[in-house]
């Protein structure tokens, strides 16, 4: 057996934050910019060996993350500062490591997760924003956040989310368990906060698109429940834009003792 094969293997988890506006999604793809590709390149430079990461949730093009979690395996023994400060020094400015934690062999960023949490940020103002234009979705019609919140409560629990599932979704089942969904207003911002065991493709953005129709008084509150029962994607509203969506947290069993930093996004109170 070679010396290389005898080296111990370390499993490391990282918390990742990124502005997805300049990337073609999380997942590494040929000939396009991805968050995964940039992170793996930076980690490989620090580890001095090729690194492959596994993430909790593969976000789409333009979607952001403040609470993404990844893991990787390496034979490189490094101090925590190397996996945070060192990796950040090799990353572009719109991707950053937030924390590092050594994890046991049975940990997997995706399969060990018990829930994912997203926040969708709507800038509800007559005039469009400039500085935050890629970090929020602009909607100029006045939105009734309390009405949206009431309408959304029918989505709680285990349901068939076919009406809010992208046509190209590859999940084996449309059933998902929504643990909470809250709609609140913070000045000009309307925030849709949703947590579930997992999500079908475009689920959050499709729900938000329909909730905005309710909030603008273009549809009655009962419409969301009717859409859920219909199990027909063609009846729901258009998919909300990617810019306002953030993966803000991923839940894991307490035994892994992973850090839980403020969720953000940072321009909102947590």
UniProtKB/Swiss-Prot annotation:
Record InterPro entries: PsdUridine_synth_cat_dom_sf, PsdUridine_synth_TruA, PsdUridine_synth_TruA_a/b_dom, PsdUridine_synth_TruA_C, TruA/RsuA/RluB/E/F_N
UniProt site (Interaction with tRNA): 58, 78, 110, 126, 139
Keyword Isomerase appears in the UniProt entry: yes
CDD domains: PseudoU_synth_EcTruA
GO MF terms, alphabetically ordered: RNA binding; tRNA pseudouridine(38-40) synthase activity
Active site: residue positions: 60
EC numbers on record: 5.4.99.12
Keywords from the named record: Isomerase, tRNA processing
NCBIfam families: hisT_truA (TIGR00071)
Assembly with partners or alone: Homodimer.
Protein name: tRNA pseudouridine synthase A
């Amino acid at each position: 057996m070679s010396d290389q094969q005898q080296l111990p293997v370390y499993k490391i988890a990282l918390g990742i934050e990124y502005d997805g506006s300049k990337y073609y999604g999380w997942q590494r793809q040929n000939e396009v910019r991805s968050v995964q590709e940039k992170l793996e390149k930076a980690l490989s430079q620090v580890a001095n060996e090729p690194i492959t990461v596994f993430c909790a949730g593969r976000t789409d093009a333009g979607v952001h993350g403040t609470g993404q979690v990844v893991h990787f395996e390496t034979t490189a023994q490094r101090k925590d500062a190397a996996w945070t400060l060192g990796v950040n020094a090799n990353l572009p400015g719109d991707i950053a490591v937030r924390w590092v934690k050594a994890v046991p062999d049975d940990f997997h960023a995706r399969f060990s997760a018990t829930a994912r949490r997203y926040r969708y940020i709507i800038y509800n103002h007559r005039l469009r924003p400039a500085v935050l234009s890629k970090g929020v979705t602009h909607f100029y019609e006045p939105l009734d956040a309390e009405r949206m919140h009431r309408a959304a409560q029918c989505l709680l629990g285990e349901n068939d989310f076919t009406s809010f599932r992208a046509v190209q979704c590859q999940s084996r089942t449309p059933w998902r368990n929504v643990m909470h969904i809250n709609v609140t207003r913070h000045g000009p911002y309307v925030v849709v906060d949703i947590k579930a065991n997992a999500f079908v493709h475009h689920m959050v953005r499709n729900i938000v698109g329909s909730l905005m129709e309710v909030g603008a008084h273009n549809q009655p509150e009962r419409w969301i429940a009717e859409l859920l029962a219909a199990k027909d994607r063609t009846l729901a509203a258009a998919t909300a834009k990617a810019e306002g969506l953030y993966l803000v947290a991923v839940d894991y069993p307490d035994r892994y003792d992973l850090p839980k930093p403020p969720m953000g996004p940072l321009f909102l109170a947590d």
